[in-house]
Amino acid sequence: MPSTLLWGAAGGIGKALTQQLTASGHAVVAVSRHPAEMKALTPHVIAADVSQPPQVSAAARMAAGMGAPFDLFLYAAGDIASLKTAETPPADWNRILTANLTGAFLTAQASLPHLKADARLVFIGAVHERLRLPGLAAYAAAKAGLEAFAEVLRKETRLPVLVIRPGAVDTPFWKKVPFSMPKHALSPQALAEKILTALEEDKTGLLDIP
């Protein structure tokens, strides 16, 4: 049975991925700030905040005892805010960068010792070129940085790395931005299905999912 270490599991996309992965036969260790929301989806749940290095390290060690070595590392944590640069408190800037970029670094670093030699790493990114809009400086910068980090990580580890760049997805993110959700927005479940298909097809690099 393949095993997956999923960070940011309680978000809309994270939950959908947990459901799809378990349905496809994966043993999923789900790490989340809200573990109670995940217990109905997988028996292997760990509480941790990806912005806190000690919690990330402890969670990775706990996860190792539940399913290591892992076949798949998946980072689905993220956050967004709509704040113009001149009005952005440094704490909010740091929060968005941490959720989308620094957390990816922290969790990948802590997880690498517990991955199989041929493991895959997947990060949930964004089509950031289309998000360079007033109020989204932190989010767009973080997602652009995530792609650069993922590329370097691939070169360092020589493992297959995939950055998923979804279009609009129907999640609570839309409540945090002053835009209307497009009518063509994917459901988290539909996105998760497409991600699993990409994994089955051994996709790597950047993958746009409109």
Stretches found by the model and what they are:
Residues 10, 14-18:
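N-terminal Rossmann NAD(P)H-binding glycine-rich loop of SDR-like oxidoreductase domains
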Residues 42-54:
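Rossmann-fold cofactor-recognition segment
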Residues 76-82:
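Conserved NAD(P)H cofactor-binding loop of Rossmann-fold oxidoreductase domains
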Residues 84-85, 92-94:
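Substrate-binding pocket helix/loop in short-chain dehydrogenase/reductase
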Residues 108, 142:
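Active-site helix of classical SDR
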Residues 131-137:
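Active-site loop immediately N-terminal to the catalytic Tyr-X3-Lys motif
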Residues 158-159, 163-164, 179-210:
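C-terminal helical subdomain
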